[in-house]
């Protein structure tokens, strides 16, 4: 899957698979990452590590 220069939104980004996806997308040179989680502090930590932005949301 070619994601270079795409914008991505990752839910569950504070930990686990969501955090790993953010890291993988960052390595794949996406244009921007939105890290979404109910845990805003965790989402912000992930976003900071991948030059993204954090959003608090319950998508369940």
Functional labels for PLM-detected ranges:
Residues 4-7, 30:
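Phosphate-coordination loops involved in phosphoryl transfer and adenosine-cofactor binding
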Residues 9, 34, 53-55:
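Conserved Rossmann-like nucleotide-binding pocket used by diverse enzymes
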């Amino acid at each position: 899957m070619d994601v270079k220069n795409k914008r991505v939104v990752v839910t569950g980004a504070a930990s686990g698979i969501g955090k790993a996806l953010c890291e993988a997308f960052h390595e794949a040179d996406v244009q921007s990452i939105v890290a979404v989680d109910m845990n805003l502090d965790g989402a912000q930590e992930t976003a900071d590590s991948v030059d993204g932005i954090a959003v608090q949301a319950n998508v369940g």
